[in-house]
């Protein structure tokens, strides 16, 4: 909003790497595969996730799984990531849903298909 940078790019990169590899405790690999963005959970039921260059999201629901991560928070984050096309690992074919393209944020130019 203000454009004020509060951490250096190197610190941000380090924090996102740690979030991606360990932020969801022993299920971090599954989280990264399913949701596709670095995330950090807390044992109170909160989850913070970051899609670099796109934005962040937060969830809260106190029902936890065996790893200590919010069950509903994971479901919500996965749904939002897929709907909004936030995953770092999504192929070009996995674009945001049409309803998400009308939401806030920068608009992507639409590609026109070539017909022969």
Whereabouts are the PLM-identified features?
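Structured C-terminal helix/loop/strand segments within mature extracytoplasmic catalytic/sensor domains
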Residues: 1-113
């Amino acid at each position: 909003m203000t454009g004020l940078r509060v951490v250096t790019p190197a610190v941000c990169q380090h924090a996102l790497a740690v979030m991606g590899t360990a932020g969801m405790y022993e299920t971090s690999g599954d989280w990264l595969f399913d949701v596709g963005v670095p995330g950090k959970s807390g044992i109170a039921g909160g989850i913070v996730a970051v899609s670099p260059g796109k934005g962040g999201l937060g969830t809260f629901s106190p029902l936890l799984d065996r790893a200590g991560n919010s069950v509903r928070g994971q479901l919500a984050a996965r749904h939002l990531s897929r709907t909004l096309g936030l995953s770092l690992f999504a192929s070009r074919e996995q674009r945001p849903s049409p309803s998400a393209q009308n939401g806030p944020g920068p608009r992507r130019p639409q590609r026109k298909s070539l017909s022969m």
